């Protein structure tokens, strides 16, 4: 299930990204700051602010911006929808004022495989504080392993989860991205993937996002029609 959260336009220019501001607004107005769904594991994906126009290292949203919220958790989507309806009038992310939210079509899951593209970088921090990126030979192995652990954690059948597989699509176009979050430098990966396996498993994975910190704007994906 997917929600598109729309914001009115502003000519204010923002430097780099506004991941922290989006997350803060979402916690204050839609999901609450005091729950167990933040930080280490989120069963949802919250995208960065999209719809902007970039000029060098700055980005502005003269025509408005939008954020995607995606989850397979019905209770969570209902809670967020109710809070957006009741609590958000006049609230802002920076100078971008909340406008409305709308349900959008779920991911189109194909019968055999999906072509999946990252809308925001996939983040995988290792125990030694280094980052696993598309430049690493074991990137896919690590991403697949983490994805399976997340899927099992939300209650999916382990045998069905183990049907999941993924490979790079046009790896020559994959890239790394340096992004700061709350003053902390992070290195993420932009990539296209071929994903196979049980259809419900695939859909659940996309709804949670890829990698870590999917509730902070990382790892948001889209599926090619």
Briefly describe each language-model feature range.
Residues 1-225:
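RNA-interacting cores
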């Amino acid at each position: 299930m997917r929600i598109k959260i729309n914001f009115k336009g502003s000519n204010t220019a923002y430097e780099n990204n506004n991941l922290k501001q989006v997350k803060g607004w979402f916690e204050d107005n839609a999901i609450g700051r005091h729950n167990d769904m933040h930080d280490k594991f989120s069963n949802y994906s919250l995208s960065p602010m999209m719809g902007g126009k970039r000029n060098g290292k700055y980005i502005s949203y003269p025509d408005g911006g939008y954020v995607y919220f995606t989850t397979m958790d019905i209770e969570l989507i209902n809670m967020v929808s109710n809070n957006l309806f009741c609590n958000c009038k006049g609230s802002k992310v920076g100078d971008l004022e909340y406008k409305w939210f709308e349900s959008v079509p779920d991911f189109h899951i194909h019968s055999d495989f999906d072509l999946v593209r990252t809308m925001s970088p996939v983040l995988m921090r290792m125990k030694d504080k280094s980052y696993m990126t598309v430049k690493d030979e074991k990137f896919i192995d690590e991403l697949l392993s983490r994805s399976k652990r997340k899927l099992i954690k939300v209650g999916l059948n382990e045998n069905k989860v183990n049907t999941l597989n993924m490979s790079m699509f046009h790896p020559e176009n994959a890239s790394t991205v340096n992004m700061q979050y709350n003053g902390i430098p992070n290195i993420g990966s932009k990539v296209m993937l071929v994903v196979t396996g049980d259809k419900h498993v695939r859909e659940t994975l996309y709804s949670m996002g890829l990698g870590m910190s999917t509730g902070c704007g990382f790892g948001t994906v889209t599926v090619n029609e």
